Amino acid sequence: MLYAKAQSLERGLRERWGRLLHTAMLTLSASSTDDSGNPLPPIEHLEELLSSWEAVRRALSRVLDGREWEYLAILEPHESGYVHIHVGVFVKGPVVAEQFQPVIDAHLRNCDLAKREAHEIVDDDGEEDTVRVRRASHPSRQDGIQNLGAYLAAYMAGEYGKEATEMPEHVQRFYAVMWATGRQWFRPSNGAQ
């Protein structure tokens, strides 16, 4: 059900905004070890990662004030089983990666486990890193992510059709943390529901 909702999100926005639809994907993470290098309990890690969410959401609202936009945030496991967040942002009109620096800064200020070196807008080669911006491509074209909503949902869904016990071990650990905390894997903006 979520996959269908996420897949229809960008399609609906493309119908409303046409060629003005632009997308950005922000990645928010947190260190999975303490200052001594010891692994953190996965639930403690998740709670700290999510501690910045309200500040991130407010910063996103300020950055895009006066514009039409929606978001879809997805929790997804690393190979280690620890969680990171992908925030898909759908905007009417052009955006550039640097516009989202205040959003990344809000995460860094409010999540004690977030490290600046893991949240650079542009990497050492000058390529987009923590924030990737694209003009949404039309489904008939071969370049770009065809549907960012579906792309984000694919992170969450993992391998479709498999039972949870048949998923890779890191995905099973992720499922256990989600179940133990009662957390949803996705957070849509009001207009993206």
Go through each PLM region and give its residues.
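Short hydrophobic/aromatic beta-strand micro-patches
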Residues: G88-F90
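Right-hand nucleic-acid polymerase module
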Residues: M1-V83, K92-Q193
